[in-house]
UniProtKB/Swiss-Prot annotation:
Protein source organism: Tityus fasciolatus (Central Brazilian scorpion)
Tissue expr: Expressed by the venom gland.
Record function comment: Beta toxins bind voltage-independently at site-4 of sodium channels (Nav) and shift the voltage of activation toward more negative potentials thereby affecting sodium channel activation and promoting spontaneous and repetitive firing. This toxin is active against hNav1.3/SCN3A.
Protein name: Toxin Tf2
Coiled coil: none
Positions of post-translational Cysteine amide modification: C82
């Protein structure tokens, strides 16, 4: 039973590492990258191109990205510097 739990724990860790993190794309000022007036599919392309993410979508009004590499910064409420 202990080995089974260890195995499951390792699989969960691998999934977290391989999938990457997720979050809102940021602009050069540290604000969420707006998709308010962008065409459909814009955020998916932006996330893949600029953040090297696996996918993205417009979580109105900002681009939200999935599978972002750990070395790429995404918007975070705790470290928000937008407009400051």
């Amino acid at each position: 039973m202990k080995r089974f739990l260890l195995f499951i724990s390792i699989l969960m860790m691998i999934g977290t590492i391989v999938v990457g993190k997720e979050g809102y794309a940021m602009d050069h000022e540290g604000c969420k990258f707006s998709c308010f007036i962008r065409p459909s599919g814009f955020c998916d392309g932006y996330c893949k191109t600029h953040l090297k993410a696996s996918s993205g979508y417009c979580a109105w009004p900002a681009c939200y990205c999935y599978g972002v590499p750990s070395n790429i910064k995404v918007w975070d409420y705790a470290t928000n510097k937008c407009g400051k």
